[in-house]
């Protein structure tokens, strides 16, 4: 049975952090817009945004070594780190605005202060880390970073990691106290609670099955109502496809030229979680290592203090897995049905070029619990097998596209694909993902509502004072933003409470 629904201004597909952020921005900028949300699951933030399905790192390039590469001349390129840090500052400002205006409450339920650290072993890696520290230390965005290769100092910083460790190999770490742990699931749920108060119609258990352009340039969505069994038709002027791994299939259904020659490759993630609370309490940091030679960027190992359900947890990973599903709740046919005549060459080219990734995934899938424990013991030498279990994290669909570098190039970032007229946009990709949600959704606004940006700019700057400004070039504004966001999000006093 099918029913025709009324037209609406905006439809958001997927109730994850991206749709939540875009909805919140739009309701603050243009409260008159009528917005509908369709989510096939029963609650918000249950796929990639869920707290158990991602690392929960507030990605600001404070500790992630893959954001600072070593150039041929041995110098360190920090341009990507600067960009990611500035993007995270935008998120902090928007969250602080929402808290200060009482639009969301209890920020401690979604963001906690935690030192961010990088740790490496071996002479070559120690040399790299020292050069990285020297390249970042005087940059105002990375103020307060410390470096040490003294084992006694490292025992103060990371006692659990140093206990039982042989000291015959060089080891070094950097530490910066302004890092954060972010519960993106809790944040997503808060944002949707706020959107409900703004008369946004949030429809759970509604699966979008098709999306087609109408003769008058609008978009008609075929939506399956899982509660009634009915097929509904909804029409909107603007559609945002924020369905995580499910976005690629829906983007392909739009038929827009920009959707061609794009593929996706799913990578699943596993984390080890500590079951011994005594061990959990011995560690207080997010410690990122260096990916092994030949391993993809998403394989960077890290040992993380997390705050989930107001409880301190300890996770290690990620370990990669393979499933043809594009979502944890997806279908085993997702990968094969994403291959179309316009992207088959792109996908095949990637298959040939990415043999190292294929080999890595096969090796990861074959790992036993004890083999994973061996990798964990590179971080915690005294780790006991019985103290650690496995949690299956979310699916990440890495974008494959044709670039100037050649056909079938695997992308490791987050990417907005939009129609030339701005009437539809989709978010594809993975890391740094949710941390940059505000920057990415501002990009959606710029691409899809260019005629309204001049009108909206004063309000955007009220919410996000550094919008359009380089904080690295404006230290006074940077320090004011850091102070005000720390205060609004309660980060300063919480750090004192947990240190």
UniProtKB/Swiss-Prot annotation:
Its cofactor is FAD. GO terms for biological process: tricarboxylic acid cycle. GO terms for molecular function: 2-hydroxyglutarate dehydrogenase activity; L-malate dehydrogenase (quinone) activity. It holds the Pfam family Mqo. Pathway: Carbohydrate metabolism; tricarboxylic acid cycle; oxaloacetate from (S)-malate (quinone route): step 1/1. The keyword rRNA-binding does not apply. It is an enzyme of class 1 (oxidoreductase). InterPro entries: FAD/NAD-bd_sf, MQO. Its EC number is 1.1.5.4. Signal peptide: none annotated. Keywords: FAD, Flavoprotein, Oxidoreductase, Tricarboxylic acid cycle. It catalyses: (S)-malate + a quinone = a quinol + oxaloacetate. HAMAP family: MQO (MF_00212). Belongs to the MQO family. PANTHER family: L-2-HYDROXYGLUTARATE DEHYDROGENASE, MITOCHONDRIAL. This is Probable malate:quinone oxidoreductase. It comes from Brevibacillus brevis (strain 47 / JCM 6285 / NBRC 100599). The lineage of its organism: Bacteria, Bacillati, Bacillota, Bacilli, Bacillales.
């Amino acid at each position: 049975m099918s029913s025709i629904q009324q037209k609406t201004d905006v439809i958001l597909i997927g109730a994850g952090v991206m749709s939540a952020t875009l909805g919140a921005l739009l309701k603050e900028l243009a409260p008159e817009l009528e917005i509908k949300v369709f989510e096939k699951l029963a609650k918000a933030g249950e796929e990639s945004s869920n707290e158990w399905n991602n690392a929960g790192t507030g990605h600001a390039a404070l500790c992630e070594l893959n954001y600072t590469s070593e150039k041929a001349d041995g110098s360190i390129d920090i341009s990507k780190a600067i960009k990611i840090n500035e993007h995270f500052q935008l998120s902090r400002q928007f969250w602080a605005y929402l808290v200060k205006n009482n639009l969301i409450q209890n920020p401690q339920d979604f963001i906690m202060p935690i030192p961010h650290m990088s740790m490496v072993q071996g002479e070559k890696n120690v040399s790299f880390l020292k050069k990285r520290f020297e390249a970042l230390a005087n940059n105002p965005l990375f103020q307060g970073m410390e470096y040490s290769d003294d084992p006694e100092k490292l025992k103060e910083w990371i006692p659990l990691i140093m206990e039982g460790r042989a000291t015959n190999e060089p080891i070094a770490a950097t530490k910066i106290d302004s890092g954060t742990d972010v519960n993106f699931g809790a944040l997503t749920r808060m944002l949707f609670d706020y959107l409900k108060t703004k008369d946004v119609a949030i429809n759970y258990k509604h699966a979008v099955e098709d999306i087609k352009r109408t003769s008058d340039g609008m978009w008609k969505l075929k939506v399956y109502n899982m509660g009634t069994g009915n097929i509904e038709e909804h029409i909107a002027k603007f559609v945002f496809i924020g369905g995580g791994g499910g976005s690629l299939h829906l983007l392909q259904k739009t038929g827009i030229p920009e959707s061609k020659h794009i593929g996706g490759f799913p990578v699943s993630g596993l984390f080890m979680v500590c079951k011994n609370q005594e061990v959990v309490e011995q560690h207080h940091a997010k410690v990122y290592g260096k990916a092994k030679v030949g391993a993809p960027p998403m394989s960077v190992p890290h040992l993380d203090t997390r705050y989930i359900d107001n409880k301190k947890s300890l996770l290690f990973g990620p370990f990669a897995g393979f499933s043809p599903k594009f979502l944890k709740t997806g279908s085993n046919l997702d990968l094969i049905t994403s291959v179309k005549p316009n992207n088959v060459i792109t996908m095949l080219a990637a298959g040939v070029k990415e043999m190292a990734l294929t080999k890595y995934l096969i090796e990861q899938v074959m790992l036993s619990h004890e083999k994973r424990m061996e990798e964990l013991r590179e971080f915690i030498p005294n780790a006991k097998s019985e103290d650690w279990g496995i949690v299956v994290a979310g699916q990440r669909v890495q974008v494959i596209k044709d670039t100037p570098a050649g056909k079938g190039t695997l992308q490791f970032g987050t990417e907005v694909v939009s129609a030339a007229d701005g009437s539809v946009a989709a978010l594809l990709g993975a890391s740094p993902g949710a941390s940059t949600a505000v920057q990415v959704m501002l990009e959606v606004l710029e691409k899809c509502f260019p005629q309204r940006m001049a009108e909206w700019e004063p309000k955007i700057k009220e919410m996000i004072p550094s919008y359009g400004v380089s904080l690295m070039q404006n230290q006074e504004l940077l320090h004011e933003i850091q102070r005000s966001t720390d205060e609004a999000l309660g980060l300063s006093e919480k750090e004192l409470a947990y240190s």
